[in-house]
């Protein structure tokens, strides 16, 4: 609520409580007091009154005075009656004012309530009732604007209130309890709740399934130094950093950590030779001295165990695994594993068996060699990477090597593009080609004929008396190519390439906007004023030519005033934003006008300087 509304409410309350309108107006209209001082003065005035003063104190006081002075009643009875009637009239006027303000407040409260219930879909309000309330409010506004009686206006308002009372049984407690419960769960839940439920990464591919919170927890738990998130622009950079941290950690430790990596999947050696990639069985009697690595099956439930282990290794999984017998032959063991499958009998074993083969070894994919990376001159001069680093990469890292190199290549390509663009802009730094063309073409038009010297500025609309000779001369030329729109943005774009700290350029843009708005409002008057010196066959094109030519003359003069300002290679953001907004206003002003134009014809008898000037007015800078 602003200051005027506060003063109005305070004055109304003071008049109601004190019945002294003159003194309240004196306090309200005192310019030396601030808002708080006025409110304090009205409060002190109300407190100074005697408590228990009746509502009609003024009327009773006037009646008592009349009764106590019978001489005055006999002398001038009409004056006493006038005083009483004036007091009653003032009270009636104040009551009417209060009733009107009460209707306004009730109407606004109902509008706010209906809008809230319509927009909040989670509050299940009856749509039919809301529509009836809206209809009653619209009827209230129509009756109020048409000057209907107070009873009709109050009837519509009371109907809307009665309909709204039917919606008061809507309970918002369920909605508020649900939102408070969600907020409490969000506050109480730890930040790393999802990260704690997921298993720790045991291979490099596991990092691709982690989100940013899980990656952050892994880095905080395994990185001793301070991690700077500002150096990493995306989630992929954080993921690559976590992968590098995992590689360094697995390379430094001789044995993998129990909580992050599974034990090596090496099959147990057997006494009898077995074909490649066949599960091996081992009992405690066959391997009494083999060490048993600790395994963590609870952290990797989806990872299948490639080989059956002994009871000492996984006592929890022993009941679900078949118990092999030491004196079984190789055929019986395989048959017990694949009972429902027809297997060939008496298959001879191979002569040689490679025990170094690993079960479940991932086969490498063959693909075409990648394209050479697009790098800058600095990278070409950099020494090549060490081949030992490349040989030490695992198969999983080689699968992602192409993706990482492609990502780096794209970054280098973007950097090279920005460097070339900056180099290209640096060649034109300090050169404003559009400004130079505007100055040269406008000066050429002014110097060709004496009558082209612009006498007006953009502070007002161009006067016909200043362009009498020019109008008669232009009537012999073809002006059908003059566009009936104003290219405000294109003509004033050179101003955005100046570094102006005093806001002179922004002020000129606002002045140019006012100039074109005034010309659009007075276009009909200018047409009649210019036609008095004619008549002219192409009067609309003639008026538009004078409007634009007068502006170009003033713009050329303004360029001379800001010639000492430093130039920019790119537009000033502040100036450019103002120019875009003002361009919309100018186009809207001229878009509402109607013109009487002729067909465009090619008349080569027009002089070259006039053709260049018309092209410049149409924002066509290909003139030189």
UniProtKB/Swiss-Prot annotation:
Residues 283-324 are annotated as: 3 X 11 AA repeats, motif B. Residues 256-280 are annotated as: 2 X 13 AA tandem repeats, motif A. Transmembrane segments: none annotated. Residues 279-324 have a biased composition (Low complexity). It is found in: Virion. GO terms for cellular component: viral capsid. InterPro entries: Nucleo_P80/P87 (IPR009893). Pfam families: Nucleo_P87. Its main location: virion. The keyword Repeat applies. Residues 183-208, 254-326, 341-410 are annotated as: Disordered. This is Capsid protein p87. It comes from Orgyia pseudotsugata multicapsid polyhedrosis virus. The gene is P87.
């Amino acid at each position: 609520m602003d200051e005027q509304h506060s003063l109005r409410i305070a004055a109304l309350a003071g008049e109601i409580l004190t019945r002294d309108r003159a003194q309240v107006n004196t306090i309200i209209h005192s310019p030396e007091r601030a808002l708080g001082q006025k409110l304090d003065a009205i409060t002190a005035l109300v407190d100074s009154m005697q408590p228990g003063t009746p509502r009609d104190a003024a009327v009773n006081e006037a009646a008592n005075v009349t009764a106590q002075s019978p001489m005055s009643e006999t002398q001038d009875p009409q004056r006493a009656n006038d005083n009483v009637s004036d007091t009653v009239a003032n009270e009636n006027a104040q009551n009417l004012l209060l009733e009107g303000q009460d209707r306004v407040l009730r109407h606004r409260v109902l509008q706010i309530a209906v809008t809230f219930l319509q927009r909040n879909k989670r509050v299940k309000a009856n749509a039919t009732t809301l529509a009836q309330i809206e209809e009653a409010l619209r009827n209230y506004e129509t009756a109020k604007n048409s000057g209907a009686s107070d009873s009709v206006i109050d009837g519509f308002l009371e109907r809307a209130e009665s309909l709204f009372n039917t919606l008061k049984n809507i309970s918002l407690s369920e909605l508020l309890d649900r939102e408070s419960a969600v907020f409490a769960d969000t506050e109480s839940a730890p930040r790393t709740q999802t990260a704690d439920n997921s298993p720790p990464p045991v291979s490099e591919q596991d990092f691709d399934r982690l989100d940013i919170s899980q990656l952050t927890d892994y880095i905080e738990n395994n990185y001793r130094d301070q991690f700077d998130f500002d150096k990493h622009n995306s989630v992929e950079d954080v993921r690559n950093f976590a992968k590098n941290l995992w590689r360094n950690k697995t390379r430094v430790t001789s044995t993998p950590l129990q909580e992050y990596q599974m034990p090596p999947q090496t099959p147990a050696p057997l006494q009898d030779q077995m074909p490649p990639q066949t599960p091996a069985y081992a009992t405690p009697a066959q391997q009494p001295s083999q060490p048993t690595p600790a395994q963590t099956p609870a952290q990797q439930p989806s990872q299948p165990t490639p080989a059956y282990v002994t009871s000492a290794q996984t006592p929890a999984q022993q009941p679900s695994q078949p118990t092999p017998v030491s004196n079984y032959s190789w055929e019986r063991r395989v048959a017990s594993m694949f009972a429902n499958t027809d297997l060939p009998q008496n298959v001879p074993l191979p002569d040689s068996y490679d025990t170094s083969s690993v079960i479940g070894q991932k086969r490498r994919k063959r693909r075409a060699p990648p394209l050479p990376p697009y790098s800058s001159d600095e990278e070409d001069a950099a020494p090549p990477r060490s081949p030992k680093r490349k040989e030490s990469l695992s198969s999983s890292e080689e699968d992602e090597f192409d993706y990482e190199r492609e990502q780096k290549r794209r970054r280098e390509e973007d950097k090279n593009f920005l460097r070339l663009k900056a180099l290209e802009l640096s060649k034109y730094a300090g050169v404003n080609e559009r400004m130079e063309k505007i100055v040269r073409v406008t000066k050429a038009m002014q110097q060709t004929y004496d009558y082209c010297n612009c006498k007006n500025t953009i502070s007002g609309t161009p006067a016909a008396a200043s362009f009498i000779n020019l109008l008669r001369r232009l009537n012999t030329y073809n002006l059908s190519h003059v566009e009936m729109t104003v290219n405000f943005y294109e003509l004033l774009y050179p101003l955005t390439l100046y570094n102006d700290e005093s806001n002179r350029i922004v002020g000129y843009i606002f002045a140019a906007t006012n100039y074109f708005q005034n010309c659009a409002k007075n276009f009909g008057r200018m047409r009649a004023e210019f036609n008095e010196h004619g008549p002219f066959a192409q009067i609309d094109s003639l008026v538009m030519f004078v409007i634009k030519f007068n502006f170009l003359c003033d713009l050329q003069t303004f360029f001379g005033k800001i010639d000492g300002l430093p130039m920019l290679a790119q537009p000033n953001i502040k100036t450019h934003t103002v120019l875009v907004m003002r361009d919309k206003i100018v186009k809207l002003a001229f878009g509402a006008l109607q013109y009487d134009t002729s067909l465009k014809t090619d008349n080569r008898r027009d002089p070259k300087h006039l053709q260049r000037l018309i092209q410049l007015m149409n924002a066509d800078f290909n003139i030189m």
